[in-house]
A protein has these predicted regions:
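Terminal, contiguous helix-loop blocks that mediate binding/assembly
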Residues: 2-488
Length: 488
């Protein structure tokens, strides 16, 4: 869950996609004090500054919930601060020896020691600052959970671990919507979680609202719904919910495949019904076209070769959407989250659908005005299960990034045929895109946000899944123009 402020904070709830999304945020930071490059993004909306031992920290303003054992090598209070009481790097004085030495007990102490979780290769490369080595790792086949590709460090207050249920890679133990409801209502969890929310709210100057991501098919849906109910009652802020459907489904503990399919269906139905009550707007996300009893029909993206059931790949696609879509309320001169939700939930219809073009299929030497004039077909692919998004009678919020004003149209002296087009009068990318949607979508309204800066992608983003038609600047290579006309 994210806390939004303007600086306006947004408080975030978590799922695996969220960690790729937060990685994007940190990749766009500029740590060079002599740099003259100015960012269009206000990072204070999702991040907070703090101090520890006179050192400045900058961490996501968020709360995450996961099961016991999911953190693997990460301590339950996070890895932002070094534990000063234990000499972790001293091989002659292990953690176990230090703990034994600190206990005033005469008798022999019985020790039950769990096997230490191995540190993933990517995390080892980060800790040793071998960034180039991290780029060469086969992350697609080695990553199984979000700590494996975590780049950002989190405040101890952000981490909430469920003690009653244990994480398993091959099955899900927190199974039903009702189990999630009961978990949130347990005294230890609700008190700790709500105290952490309150702490973030108290340090915020002007909280816009809450941005929530969670798995909709298991017990975390119940946890999330109770969380939203609490936030709605306690704070009366805008709540933007993004229920997520994974690309493949684990069976639940003590349930066979048929029973697990039925449980997922019921969990999803309960989730959608309750989100209509407690969220200002919710948008289901998945790279699968069908996510009801069965989860299948992977979406196709013309320039992306991804493995549909690989969480590392699918989370990168959804995080790309979230990072781009959220720019509307994360820019320095942006509107509020409440404005987005109000515009899209017309007639109090709380559910919306999403689509993405990854990347935008414009040629690297082409102007936007020429691209829009020649393009035919669907520009974007739906990433909401069961939703085929039409073009007529729709309300939409569109964000386009990476096209500088110099690529809008030719200068007047070399414009030639462009001068005959109605769009030549447009003075900005957003204005030209707005005109495009007015002309191509009947009885529709579109709000367009345009950002010149491209999405900065670095390891651990799976850059290898873009095919060779994409240039290093993110545009389609010029010689491929005939292949991409009409593709979205």
């Amino acid at each position: 869950m994210s806390f939004l402020e303007h600086s306006s904070e947004i408080i975030k709830n978590f799922s695996a996609i969220f960690f790729v999304y937060i990685n994007f945020q940190e990749h766009s930071f500029n740590y060079d004090p002599e740099s003259t490059e100015s960012s269009e993004i206000n990072h204070d909306i999702l991040f907070r500054e703090g101090t520890h031992n006179r050192n400045i920290t900058y961490t996501p303003r968020m709360l995450l919930v996961d099961l016991k054992g999911s953190l693997k090598y990460i301590p339950e209070d996070g890895n932002l601060y070094t534990n000063q009481q234990l000499e972790l790097n001293n091989p002659e004085n292990s953690v176990l020896d230090q703990v034994r030495g600190s206990i005033a007990w005469d008798d022999e102490i019985e020790v039950m020691e769990a096997e230490e979780a191995p540190v993933p290769d990517y995390q080892k490369a980060l800790q040793s600052t071998e960034i180039e080595a991290a780029k060469n790792l086969n992350l697609k086949d080695s990553i199984s959970n979000w700590p494996d590709f975590m780049y950002t460090r989190y405040h101890p207050r952000s981490i909430n671990i469920v003690k009653e249920y244990e994480y398993h890679e091959e099955m899900s133990s927190l199974d039903t919507f009702s189990a999630g409801l009961k978990l949130f209502e347990s005294s230890y969890f609700e008190d700790d979680f709500c105290d952490n929310v309150r702490s973030y709210m108290e340090e915020s100057n002007h909280c816009q609202g809450f941005q929530t991501l969670f798995d909709a098919v298991d017990g975390f849906s119940g946890v999330a719904v109770k969380c939203l109910e609490y936030l709605q009652d306690e704070y009366s802020k805008t709540i933007f919910a993004l229920p997520l459907i994974p690309p493949w489904a684990k069976n639940f503990q003590f349930a066979d495949e048929a029973m697990s399919d039925s449980i997922r269906l019921i969990n999803t139905a309960f989730t959608y019904a309750k989100l209509s009550e407690h969220a200002s707007l919710f948008v289901p996300l998945s790279t699968m076209g069908r996510a009801w009893r069965a989860i299948d029909e992977p979406r196709k993206f013309p320039f992306v070769s991804y493995e549909p059931t690989n969480l590392y790949h699918s989370s990168a696609i959804l995080a790309s959407f979230l990072d781009t879509m959220s720019l509307r309320y994360r820019l320095k001169d942006s509107s509020f989250l409440s404005t987005l939700c109000t515009e899209l939930n017309g007639y109090n219809r709380k559910m919306a659908a999403a689509k993405i073009s990854l990347p935008f299929p414009m040629n690297e030497k082409e102007d936007l005005i020429d691209f829009l004039d020649r393009f035919e077909g669907e520009m974007m692919e739906s990433i909401t299960p069961g939703a085929k998004i039409g073009t007529d009678r729709v309300l939409q919020s569109v964000t386009l990034r990476g096209i500088p004003k110099t690529r809008l149209k030719r200068p007047l002296e070399s414009a030639k045929n462009q001068m005959k087009m109605a769009a030549f009068k447009c003075g900005s990318v957003s204005e030209m895109m707005q005109l495009y949607y007015q002309c191509s979508n009947y009885a529709s309204l579109a709000h367009v946000t345009a950002v010149e800066g491209r999405m900065k992608i670095k390891s651990p983003f799976p850059m290898e899944f873009f095919d060779n038609r994409i240039a290093s600047n993110g545009f389609v290579k010029e010689f491929q123009s005939a292949d991409v006309n009409g593709e979205g």
